[in-house]
Amino acid sequence: MTISKQQVVRWLDLAAEIFKEQQDFLTDLDREIGDADHGLNMNRGFQKVQEKLPGVADKDIGTIMKTTGMTLLSSIGGASGPLYGTFFIRSATSVMAKEELNLAELTQMLQNGVDGIVQRGKAEIGDKTMVDTWHGILESLNQEQETSFIDALDRAVAEAEKAMKGTIPLQAKKGRASYLGERSIGHQDPGATSTYLLFSALRSAAAQ
């Protein structure tokens, strides 16, 4: 099984709807340890992405991903714009001219994107950031390469949720939350949460 470029477009469309629905939830999380703008920023950025989708729906997956990244870079404020923008731009590098992706190609695409996040944000596993959720996703996908496409995504979603919730007892080492020191402990990281929501949308789109 593969994921088609039409399903990639559907993924981004679903993500826009999810970030619209979850704007207040993400902002409430960010109010505890950040600038209280993560939900607003993610919603605004992905609404702009959604507006661009009709213009790239017939393009290859790499072009779709790169356009998404450039749109997020120009429309999201705070730290999340550069990080998510970089994720999509770097993800595009291995999927230019691709019309569909198998599980290995999808995993490599996501790995390239996460490598970009790490290089840009300098976050490591355990720093209480979106990198924690991405690590859970990629570790799971790499272990499930012989599993069916949807089963592999299902297991990765479960690991993403575990990693997201795993940020609650951590002390933040990066971003605005790090200024709180030990007071950041006990709160779920907003970026780890938006990454979980984004990947959950990918799983949903792949099943359609």
Q: Which residue ranges define each predicted feature?
A:
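N-terminal loops that bind phosphate or other acidic moieties
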Residues: 1-208
